Design a protein with these regions (language model features):
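Cysteine-centered motifs
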Residues: 12-14
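C-terminal and inter-domain tail/linker signature
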Residues: 27-172
């Protein structure tokens, strides 16, 4: 089956009968999604804010506790940290390299199954990161994180960023 492009309400233009059925199934699944109530949206937003503030003060047990199942997906580096042990290891590695790492919230956006956050990530390179010796330089990078939910349970933080922006600031 060949996929050409995105059309309309998230449907894909497919060239065969199976594709037509896939479009129909996808459309009806989209229609079945429930728009979260104001109460659910407020609960999700409180949880995301608590999560981000706990990251800022390096209270990683609270961060892990905000998840129904802890999972970080860092798209720029193609790394996934799944489960409490892997998430703790990620915090240890990243905060060893950037002990003052913190985030500054820019905006929150709500979707059916996510809270989308725009934020600045800041830090000073004081420890080895992936073989790169500390430079003592600071970085500031605009990022987007999708906090994915099942109901009010946080199941994943998927982070998008430009790693070249950070690398350029650390090495120039």
């Amino acid at each position: 089956m060949e996929v050409h492009a995105s059309v309309g309400a998230g449907l894909c233009a497919c060239t065969d009968a199976a594709g037509t059925e896939a479009r129909r199934q996808h459309f009806f699944k989209q229609e079945e999604k429930m728009i979260p109530s104001a109460e659910v949206r407020a609960a999700r937003e409180r949880l995301v804010r608590r999560h981000m503030e706990a990251e800022n003060v390096h209270d990683y047990e609270t961060v892990i506790g905000t998840f129904a199942h802890p999972r970080y997906e860092l798209i720029a580096t193609d790394r996934t940290h799944d489960g409490p042990a892997e998430v703790r290891a990620y915090f240890k590695e990243s905060r060893t390299a950037f002990p003052d790492q913190r985030n500054e919230l820019i905006a929150l956006h709500h979707a059916d199954d996510a809270v989308i956050v725009e934020f600045w990530l800041l830090g000073t390179h004081k420890g080895v990161l992936s073989g790169i010796e500390p430079t003592g330089r600071s970085f500031r990078c605009r990022m987007t994180a999708f906090f994915l939910f099942e109901g009010t349970g946080l199941i994943c933080e998927r982070v998008y960023f430009d790693s070249a922006t950070i690398l350029r600031q650390l090495t120039s």
